[in-house]
Amino acid sequence: KKEIEIAILQPNIDPYYNKYKKSNEELFELIINQSKDYISQNTKYLILPEGYFDSGLGIDLNFINNSKLKSRIDKFLNQYKNLNLVVGAQSYKIYPESKNPPTNTSNRISDGRWVDIYNSAFQFSNDNESQFYHKSKLVVGVEFMPYKKLLEPIIGEFLLDFGGTIATRGIQNYRTNFNSKENIIVAPIICYESIYGSFVTEYVRNGAQLLVIISNDAWWGDTEGHRQLLSYSKLRAIENRRAIARSANTGISSFIDKNGKIIEKIRYNRNGIIVRNIGLENKITFYAKYGDYIARIALLMFILNVLFLFKNFLIKK
């Protein structure tokens, strides 16, 4: 079984007060300062949390490889032979002028101008173009508004007052894994997506050898929310027999083995970095191949039981 060295960084930046005062370039300098004493030429991955690069609209997908941020990242990665940086970021794509929205999730920014905004994960490497994946399980009211045309005139302003959104994030309809030049395949799973077992198995069926979960659990505060998300991560490890590297902005960042055991973590509301050798897996579990078969069998038995009781009721009647 192949093992690789992975570093997980927990920046612990308060999103309510501090995060949005810094540019993406300034946020990247924090990464360099915090990680330089921990990563080496043996480190294959440096993992950062969801939405770390979130300044302004985020990363312009049309010019991602020609940005100041990308140049700074390349300069950093060139110091390490095989290092890959996986990080969460807000990203966007602006479309040419059009009377009608070019996609179902496009938001109008001016007359005839449209933009899609994404909650994305990126992989930056020193020998490949950037790879990205857009979060596809969105949080209602925070990342998208259902029945937007109907509800926006009624509750739009009310929702904004409580930190929600009347905009809609873009998604993608397939699970994209990140591949390195050493053919290491990792699954980029963003926050809320980790609670869906069958959703995560799509990455594994597409070849993922390791699950990477990035999250920004600072919004929860010190409640049960961030602990529950961590518990879901352990289930995903067991179901797929894949180790997990989990980076959360304020915690709990952790390494989880394929049996669902937390082998190292950074406590909530702490700044830190942890480094471990983690095993890669290629075998597909029965659950990953066939999905939540127990629930389907239970549902079938329930339906048959209801039909049986209904039949007996009719006979007695």
Predicted segments, located by residue:
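Enzyme catalytic cores with a strong preference for nitrogen-chemistry domains
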Residues: 1-317
